[in-house]
A protein has these predicted regions:
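Ligand/substrate-recognition segments at binding pockets and active sites
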Residues: 227, 341, 374-442, 457, ...
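Long beta-strand-rich cores associated with HINT superfamily self-processing modules
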Residues: 513-543
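Gly/Pro-rich hinge or "lid" segments in bacterial periplasmic/extracellular proteins
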Residues: 74, 165, 170-244, 249, ...
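Append "and occasionally in soluble cytosolic enzymes with long acidic Gly/Pro-rich linkers
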Residues: 235, 314-404, 408, 466, ...
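N-terminal lobe/hinge region of extracytoplasmic solute-binding protein
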Residues: 40-91, 215-216
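Ligand-site clamp/hinge motif
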Residues: 208-211, 237-283
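Surface-exposed binding/hinge segments that line
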Residues: 99, 125, 129-196
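Extracytoplasmic/peripheral linker and loop segments enriched in polar/acidic and small residues
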Residues: 412-426, 452-517, 541-543
């Protein structure tokens, strides 16, 4: 069932008329006297709870509202101090100590302490909350048993407050990415009194994240957020590095259409289109006519489809291979996406340090062989199949093209279904799909980050697929002596992934953005992660 027409009309009306709402007066980019950044991010986030967020819009908002122990310079991937002003790596990478800065405060003015992190990491690892990234932190001593409910006493988990300003984390095994994980916003602290005022610590429906309730420790604080209305974040005066924050406010408009985003930009209603994708028919125009406002960024990210391996016919690997080998990816990137994307024949992007194995390229004859082997010659007898994607024009265009390829090459009819973002995320995570659109970027620009999400039981594994040898190789990569050995193990794991084909890589992203000249110091990067420090509106730049 599609809700696209009504949804697009509502968004179109929103995009072309500046709506004033209670508690939130919107501005226009024509008013250059205020330090207010107006932007779109593809859609509003599914949640702004750091221990539940998984989507790109959510992470972009969390970067403004929350801060973890460390931060990352996403131009160089160098780790920087966050709440922790310094840190030590001890016992050959099995013990970490973080010294928290004295002036770290919550948005209500209270100090951020080491005990806040103990509470927050206990919450992050609580089974009832449903944290999708919890498995990534099983390297912490007893984190796995606690998350599984086998251990009830969190004091036995390797997260301890040694003092008000010193936090210690003890691991059971080394993790080459651990400090990078510590710098990710999903590990940011939450304010205990605020969380428990509005519900249980591990209640996923807790209302503490609502405007008026929310307390964070990032450079901005939430003041307004209602369904289908502009989200407003204002500067947090208690943030420890408040002098580096030049913006007084960020306004994020609720748009789930790249066409409407571009129209709003063109009409001066937003400074920044930051949803990672522009309308295909506008890319060439901005690239040639307004190159100073158009930004294209090669991304460490992959666009792919997920097969539900728990549901027929995709419980059969030959069906998955048939559907995978019948896609002409070069046609998709050359005729539909048109932003110089590279076709993907693996989940992991190719980099200087890691060359992933490659699946077969477009091979309709081989695809038909696999479909026949699965018992569906010429598509006969195959169950009804639906491809589900979230509402966005480019997803629809790609889905229609791929639907036609499956019909032409396999004689299989596939229905299409689009859903709004939050509905789509729940639908996919609950394995209700046959085939679902997905996209994944590594916050760390590392293949382990992508491949690790396909291990058994990982909260981001929306395929239902499980392979013991794949899991073993991923675990072994944590203990590798060096990157050469680590990447060799990951290569073996990815070879299994491509042989089992629980997902279908389509292409590697090239992000495309629009930014007004008056927006200064906003930098784009290969993992689509914002840094709001130092960003300001330069009124003189638009004159």
């Amino acid at each position: 069932m599609s809700r696209t027409p009504l949804r697009l009309f509502a968004v179109f009306f929103l995009g072309l008329t500046l709506i004033a709402c209670s508690k939130g007066q919107q501005t226009s980019t024509s008013d250059k006297s205020q330090q207010i950044l107006r932007m779109t991010i593809g859609s509003l986030p599914g949640t702004i709870d750091p221990h539940q967020a998984t989507d790109s819009p959510g992470i972009k908002v969390l970067a403004a509202l929350n801060e973890a122990l460390l931060t990352t310079d996403y131009q160089t991937f160098e780790l920087k101090p966050g709440v922790a002003e310094s840190w030590q790596v001890l016992d050959e990478g099995l013990r970490y100590r973080f010294q928290l800065r004295d002036n770290a405060k919550w948005s209500n003015g209270e100090p951020v302490t080491a005990q806040d992190f103990v509470y927050s990491w206990q919450r992050m690892l609580s089974a009832g909350l449903g944290n999708q990234f919890a498995l990534d932190y099983y390297v912490i001593k007893n984190a796995g048993p606690y998350h599984k409910g086998e251990l009830k006493d969190f004091s036995q988990v390797g997260v301890k407050a040694l003092s008000e300003r010193e936090l210690e984390i003890v691991l059971e095994r080394r993790d080459p990415l651990f400090l990078k994980r510590v710098a990710y916003e999903v590990t940011a602290p939450v304010h205990k009194a605020t969380v428990e005022k509005h519900g249980a610590m591990d209640d996923p429906t807790n209302k503490w994240i609502r405007a008026g309730n929310h307390v964070g420790n990032g450079p901005f604080k939430l003041v307004y957020w209602e369904l289908n209305q502009t989200m407003r974040l204002v500067k947090n005066p208690h943030y420890w590095d408040a002098d580096a924050i030049k913006l007084e406010e960020i306004q994020i408009l609720p748009v789930e259409s790249e066409t409407i985003e571009e129209r709003m930009y063109r009409s001066g209603q937003v400074h920044l289109v930051y949803g990672s994708r522009l309308p295909v028919d506008k890319i060439a125009y901005y690239r040639t006519e307004k190159p100073d406002e158009f930004f294209s960024q090669t991304a460490y990210a992959t666009y792919f489809y997920l097969f539900n391996t728990k549901k027929a016919p995709f419980d059969n690997v030959d069906v998955r291979k048939a559907f995978a080998y019948s896609i002409d990816k070069k046609l998709l990137t050359g005729s539909i996406t048109k932003n110089h994307e590279a076709p993907a024949y693996a989940l992991s992007p190719i980099s200087a340090s890691y060359q992933p194995p490659q699946m077969p390229q477009f091979n309709p004859a081989l695809a038909r062989e696999h479909l026949t082997k699965a018992g569906y010659p010429n598509g006969q007898g195959i169950p009804r199949i639906t491809l589900t994607y979230n509402t966005f024009e480019i997803h629809q265009k790609l889905a229609v093209a791929i639907q036609q390829m499956w019909k032409r090459e396999l004689n299989v009819d596939v229905a299409l279904e689009n859903q709004e973002w939050k509905v789509f995320l729940d639908f996919r995570q609950n394995l209700q799909h046959f085939i679902a659109r997905a996209g994944s970027s590594s916050t760390f620009a590392d293949p382990l980050d992508l491949l690790g999400s396909l291990t058994t039981g990982h909260g981001m594994n929306d395929t239902g697929w499980s392979n013991a040898e794949f899991d073993r190789l991923i675990r072994a990569s944590y203990e590798a002596a060096d990157d050469s050995e680590r990447f060799a193990l990951l290569h073996q794991a990815e070879t299994i992934l491509l042989e089992e084909m629980p997902l279908l890589p389509l292409f590697y992203y090239n992000y495309s953005y629009l930014k007004k000249p008056e927006v200064r110091n906003f930098e784009f990067n290969m993992v689509d992660h914002p840094n709001y420090k130092g960003v300001f509106i330069d009124a003189a730049a638009s004159r």
